[in-house]
Amino acid sequence: MSKLSRVTRTLKKPEAGGVIRSIVRAGQAIPGPPLGPILGQRGVSINQFCKEFNEKTKDIKEGIPLPTKIFIKPDRTFELKIGQPTISYFLKAAAGIEKGARQTGKEVAGLVSLKHVYEIARVKAKDEAFAMQDVPLSSIVRSIIGSARSLGIRVVKDLSVDELAAFQKERAVFLAAQKRRIWQLRQKLPKSDPNLLHSEVRD
């Protein structure tokens, strides 16, 4: 190998150190993308990361999305800092839904009460991002309400068990009809024009 080639390889080699932020699901860290290649470029053992992350989250319900910071040291070892579940996870759990609205602003995917929002805010107030800046609870509440809006979740003052059950029943009927419509549209679509499906569903 020429001296120039060795210099070029050295220059292209990713630097060790730094912090990688990602959302990783509890107990489900795997060597593949998107995190695997990023860690590999830093010289970090992705298999070791997966083993350590999955071990640290073994007592948490599998699949819960967890904000994770990976502090990479100069010797290419690392430290993990695993945060609490995301706001969107808490909101969807409180609303009893798996996904947000397909068309935000045009449909309501779920309902949560203000009590739910304040409970989530009190939990998230312990997050480093909020705690270190001493963010007021009222600001966290507003942030959560904004997240709810983006998911198509409506925040109401009060919400009884019966009201929630009635809404969920109505929502299930809506989703079933939507699924049928998508299937019908898909049968009519030319295979070369997949984008048309999303356009027609929004109309």
UniProtKB/Swiss-Prot annotation:
Keyword Transit peptide carried by entry = yes
Q: Give the source's domain of life in one word.
A: Eukaryota
Q: How far does the signal peptide extend, from start to end residue?
A: none
Principal place where this protein is found?
Answer: mitochondrion
Q: Please, one GO biological process term? A: translation
Where is this chain's protein located in or outside the cell? Mitochondrion
Asked if Ribonucleoprotein is a keyword of the record, the answer is yes
User: What CDD domains does this protein's entry cite?
Assistant: Ribosomal_L11
**SMART domains registered for this protein in UniProt:** RL11 (SM00649)
This protein's GO CC annotations: mitochondrial large ribosomal subunit; mitochondrion
What Pfam families has UniProt attached to this entry?
Ribosomal_L11, Ribosomal_L11_N
Keywords of the record: Mitochondrion, Ribonucleoprotein, Ribosomal protein, Transit peptide
| GO MF annotations, alphabetized | large ribosomal subunit rRNA binding; structural constituent of ribosome
Regions that span the bilayer: none
Subunit info? Component of the mitochondrial ribosome large subunit (39S) which comprises a 16S rRNA and about 50 distinct proteins.
Family under the similarity heading: Belongs to the universal ribosomal protein uL11 family.
Q: PANTHER family annotated for this entry?
A: 60S RIBOSOMAL PROTEIN L12, LARGE RIBOSOMAL SUBUNIT PROTEIN UL11M
What protein name is recorded for this chain?
Large ribosomal subunit protein uL11m
Organism of this sequence: Rattus norvegicus (Rat)
This chain is encoded by the gene named: Mrpl11
